[in-house]
């Protein structure tokens, strides 16, 4: 924890990543798992990040214990990464102001890239605005370019607590406009989504999101 708080996060900030989110699994598969969210302004920033950290003497010193861990006492088991492109309808991260934060990370898989693009269109045209109107507060929406279970899209919502989560989703599901949208030909669940998974996350004390 100390290496992430004192070494990695400041180093990413120096490398141009404005906000670093660090989350622990509250409910979901593969627990215990640590989730880290990094936002970049360009693909060049993504490509240069590793070299920038490697050249950052302050990071190398502050994170020495983590970086120089031995095979008999590793700092982690494995790392899995995904690269996402922000939706046009929400190009920037919306950092929540609330003190108590429960995050829900949701992934929608599709049977084809065409279906995946239709689901993204559905969000862009209708769902994002319905989310906001019914009390669901998005943090980001991303089209997964590189990762597992492709093609898919992933988004994150934030709530003050479980009660707010349940209330927000109930309001969304009951919304007349949403009922109309989800029944439109070409946009029904059967046509655009083949699997939905979610995980609940709590931010680490030092998370910037």
Residue map of PLM features:
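Short S/T/G/P-rich N-terminal loop/turn motif that feeds into the first structured element of a domain
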Residues: 1-60, 65-180, 185-209
